[in-house]
Amino acid sequence: MRHRVAGYKLKRDGGARKSLLRGLVTNVIEQERVITTVPKAKAVKPLVDRMITLGKADTLHARREAARVLFTPASVKKLFDTLATRFGQRNGGYTRIVRLGPRKGDGAEVAMIELVGSELVKRAADRAKRKEERERAAREGREPGEDE
């Protein structure tokens, strides 16, 4: 029985596990969507949520704590500038895990961990791009799909 057993070992020693999770957290924050195995996604979900909560604090101490975990300064900047404002009104539940089925090579159960609302941001950017293309085509007097 697994009573009172917390956390995921992920078949690694402590240092390798910590490095793996730090890399996953950094990638989720930078790319807003990562495909990995289900146990890794479950292990990284609370860490990503904790980082976003830390980003909402926006103090020097919070920035230094985030820099301890995240690998790149760009991810720290994105966390505090972009994600903290996006999730300002939300209290937790910043990530979702979507199961994708077994991986072809080894049959491992694969999942996608993504930030909630990231699909809306990407969709809005795509809509703005298409609208700009339509307006430019209308100004030039041609159909939107035609090449110049």
Regions found by a protein language model. Name each.
Residues 1-19, 23-148:
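Structured, basic alpha/beta domains of bacterial-type, RNA-associated proteins
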